[in-house]
Design a protein with these regions (language model features):
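C-terminal output helix
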Residues: 101, 119-128
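Short amphipathic alpha-helix used as the core "switch/output" element in two-component signaling
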Residues: 76-88
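Two-component/phosphorelay signaling modules centered on CheY-like receiver
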Residues: 25-47
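A short, hydrophobic beta-strand element within the central beta-sheet of small alpha/beta folds
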Residues: 88-100
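Acidic, metal-coordinating helix/loop segments flanking the phosphotransfer/catalytic sites
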Residues: 48-65
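CheY-like receiver
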Residues: 135-153
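Conserved acidic carboxylate
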Residues: 22
C-alpha cells in the first residue's frame, strides 16, 4: 500500500512540459517565472501564438499542460486540433474573459481549468497542480464560479 502512495507522489513530481501561449510578452514572462520559481520540476516554454505549437507537437514534444488566452486566438479550431492531436494535454484558460458563454464554449472544447489574469499566484499554481495531477478535473478560479451551473449541465 505504501509503495502505491509513494509512486503516486513520485509521478506527480515527474518532469512535465508546460507551454504558455501569450502574445503579451510581459504577462507571459511573469507567468513563466512564477511557475519556474515555484514548480522547478516542470519544464516551461513560452510562445507568442498557437500556430507555433504545431511544429513542437509534430516534432514529437509532449505538451502536458497548455496555458492560453482565447483573446489572443484568432481561431478556436486550433484548440480542437490540439486536443485531437494530443488528447492528454491539459488546457488552462488564462484570460481576462469572465463571460459564462466563453467559458462554456471552451469547456465543450476540452478546457478543464480556468484562471483570470488577475488571479493571485496561489490560484495559478493551484490550477497548475490540478492540471498536472488530476488532468480531467474541473478547476475554476472563484471569480468564475458564476459559470459553474453552465458546466454542470
Amino acid at each position: 500500500m505504501l509503495d502505491n502512495i509513494s509512486s503516486l507522489k513520485a509521478s506527480s513530481r515527474e518532469s512535465k512540459n508546460i507551454l504558455i501561449i501569450e502574445s503579451n510578452k510581459y504577462q507571459g514572462r511573469q507567468l513563466s517565472q512564477l511557475i519556474k520559481a515555484n514548480r522547478p520540476y516542470l519544464k516551461v516554454m513560452l510562445l507568442e501564438d498557437s500556430e507555433q505549437i504545431f511544429s513542437l507537437m509534430y516534432g514529437q514534444m509532449n505538451i502536458d499542460i497548455l496555458f492560453f488566452d482565447i483573446e489572443g486566438e484568432s481561431d478556436t479550431d486550433n484548440l480542437a486540433l490540439i486536443k485531437a492531436i494530443s488528447p492528454q494535454t491539459s488546457l488552462i484558460h488564462w484570460s481576462d474573459y469572465h463571460h459564462p458563454e466563453v467559458i462554456e464554449l471552451l469547456y465543450s472544447l476540452g478546457v478543464n481549468s480556468f484562471c483570470t489574469k488577475e488571479s493571485d499566484a496561489q490560484i495559478i499554481l493551484e490550477a497548475t497542480d490540478f492540471a498536472n495531477n488530476y488532468p480531467q478535473s474541473l478547476y475554476l478560479d472563484q471569480k468564475l464560479h458564476q459559470c459553474l451551473p453552465l458546466l454542470q449541465n
